[in-house]
Amino acid sequence: MSEQWLPIDVCLGGTQAFRENAKIFLPQEPEEDEASWRRRIYHATFAPYTVRIAEQAAGLILRKPIQLVSKEEGGEVDPYWEELIKNVDGYGTTLDDFARRLAISSILYGHAAVLVDYPSTEPAPNLAVERLMGLRPYLIMVDAKQIIGWRKSPEASPISPINQIRLNEYVSEPMGEFGDEVVRQIRVLEPGRWRVYRRGSEDEGWIVYQEGTTSLPVIPLAVTYSGKMAELMSRPPLLPIADLNISHAQRTADLHHSLHVAALPILTLKGFDEAGQIGLSANSIILLPPEGDGKYVEPASSAFDAQQSFITELENQMSSLGISTLFSQKMGAETAESKRLSRTDSDSLLSIVSKDLQNALQRVMDMAAAYVGMEAPEVMLDRDFDLQVLEAAQVTQYMQLWTNGAITHETLLEMLRQGEVLPNIDIEREVELTQQEKAGNMMLLPEAMRGDVQVADEQEGQDEEETEADDEQMAALDEMEEQDDA
């Protein structure tokens, strides 16, 4: 998988990573000296198309906040979890931000993981003391590249869980009064046990630096996939786009270098054979023989136009391929309705990542709950990726339909919610409050006017009932016609 990750690493690292890997992606040309090659490298830039696509995909998946719902019908989520998701890693990161980073890593590399850890200390006698001590589970994001190995028991079945995972880590430790050093270590996770290995002396090799136990009967690691091939193995779904992104950077670098070289035309002299240097300025002349000639030579612009056209075509390919990859859309023309439906298609990358991310976060919550002896809430991600914001004219039209009685209050609020005008509205609660306010205003009216308002309300209710009856009658007639046709 490391070969597949190199293009992703370059896309993620941007211009700096592209230049550092110049021997692979911008190799030295024959007869090109070292200095010229270096100049060509440092003229190269890298456009972040692949990373932008991954960020946009994660933004669509998590454009609405993650919801925690009680697993008991009608129950409420414990305030403990509401506080936990405000700071899931001990550094003030919310669950939404953590999940967004996790989704981006999964989309880029094919999979990513979350380690659910707990402070190493003496266990508290109960949950109340634990909260007073500030002990709580925290999350650590693990990129796919950090997972260097895993193992199953030889006698285990294919569906049995992994019983050992090895993670590559780099930690910063203080050195002296002001300095610090980065130390590599290997974390080995097993059910109910963990160890950290560091390099000892040359004779010792890798030695156990830290070790401990956990209260969980499983390895506290949850994995989410975007391109799963096997357990802890995947293929980056954006790899074809990353390859195009690198080709785009190569062509752009060639064009920039060509323009740099061709920016100054070359002076050519015919019939001039005098040795020595030639001085060119406004106050100097060159004497040529009668058959001599002098002129500036520059490349034809058609070569640059062809190169620019190819670069533009690569940009269009990346855009089209990105849309088709994320939404499972065809490369050809589609109707607006088919594009809208494909956003929520169960086979689209957005849908796959969303489902797997929700399952992974649910496992994370279950393991965190097992640490503290509580019931975990249910994690809910919104699956509506169709971001279509209503314009002012459309809002006015819906308001007019509601005023004319063509749609109900609930329908109006639902359309405003879907159109991102009132994205977080609780429709049932809003309707209830509106009815209460209407009843309160009724009591403030003079008694002589209440009857007129009540009659108007009753008439409105009768009109709605008549409309429903007409709709039912029309449906029955349509059904009879279909039977006659059959």
Residue ranges and their predicted role:
Residues 1-29, 155-179, 183, 311:
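Surface-exposed assembly/interface segments
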Residues 80, 90, 94-99, 106, ...:
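Short amphipathic alpha-helical segments
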Residues 1-139, 474-486:
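Extended, helix-rich architectural segments
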